[in-house]
């Protein structure tokens, strides 16, 4: 779950971790191989009745644009050719196919994506957005996943990490994510309130750099969105593992302008992906099998 970044550089990263992260990043994000093993592109044929719902101007243009801010694997990141890939890109591409459109991901600073959607220079935002009440004042969201925070630890750690007893630990996070703002920092404050040693928080610009800190032993744990922690563990060559259950669950969604004519068409396309099983297949290719939806939701509400 992502919120606009604070416009300053990471202060926790040292020269050593930055240098080493280049050699370990491919283990964590799979950048060299790009898509997961066995991945195949799923682009359904257009569905005429859904295609007819697409606003005329977009139908004539023929290309659906989506703003993304990599890296945030497995949601969006760049492969070795510099192409933006990830589960959100696959989902939006499939939705576009159902609507008879091509798909064009557009890299943009995270803080500028929603304003660009609102201004009409992007059709949608697809960059790990949490669907919450504050954002719904200006945007509608087609939800695609319910996910929460989950911690990870080194697999060779003798004493398992317990997030409920984390005082005195060093925890790596991606800056301004819910894992930092709503989980680790409040936990640390509670430690201090109880007279215990606070949590040392290492905040990084990207999730893969935070995971690298855990791999290098600079952190005792990683706290991140559950799919992010699971992806990092899967790509770590057995060096880290998720621990405990996820919590603070919330919906992830694609952002649309408020009351946009495109939203009903895109929601119908997403429902088609669910009905045909393409949604489940796309998610499974990225190792996401929990928190899936049974029906399309706009702002957590069913279409009918």
From Swiss-Prot:
PANTHER family: ARGININE-BINDING EXTRACELLULAR PROTEIN ARTP (PTHR35936:SF17), MEMBRANE-BOUND LYTIC MUREIN TRANSGLYCOSYLASE F (PTHR35936). Part of the ABC transporter complex ArgTUV involved in L-arginine import. May also transport L-citrulline. Binds L-arginine and its molecular precursor L-citrulline, but not L-histidine, L-glutamate, L-glutamine, L-lysine or L-cysteine. Transmembrane segments: none annotated. A lipid is attached at residue 27 (N-palmitoyl cysteine). This is Arginine-binding protein ArgT. Its main location: membrane. GO terms for cellular component: plasma membrane. It comes from Corynebacterium glutamicum (strain ATCC 13032 / DSM 20300 / JCM 1318 / BCRC 11384 / CCUG 27702 / LMG 3730 / NBRC 12168 / NCIMB 10025 / NRRL B-2784 / 534). It holds the Pfam family SBP_bac_3. It is a lipid-anchor. It comes from the Bacteria. InterPro entries: Solute-binding_3/MltF_N (IPR001638). The complex is probably composed of two ATP-binding proteins (ArgV), two transmembrane proteins (ArgU) and a solute-binding protein (ArgT). It is found in: Cell membrane. Residues 1-26 form the signal peptide. GO terms for biological process: amino acid transport. Belongs to the bacterial solute-binding protein 3 family. A lipid is attached at residue 27 (S-diacylglycerol cysteine). Disruption phenotype: Deletion of argTUV in an L-arginine producer strain results in a faster and 24% higher L-arginine production in comparison to the parental strain. Keywords: Amino-acid transport, Cell membrane, Lipoprotein, Membrane, Palmitate, Signal, Transport.
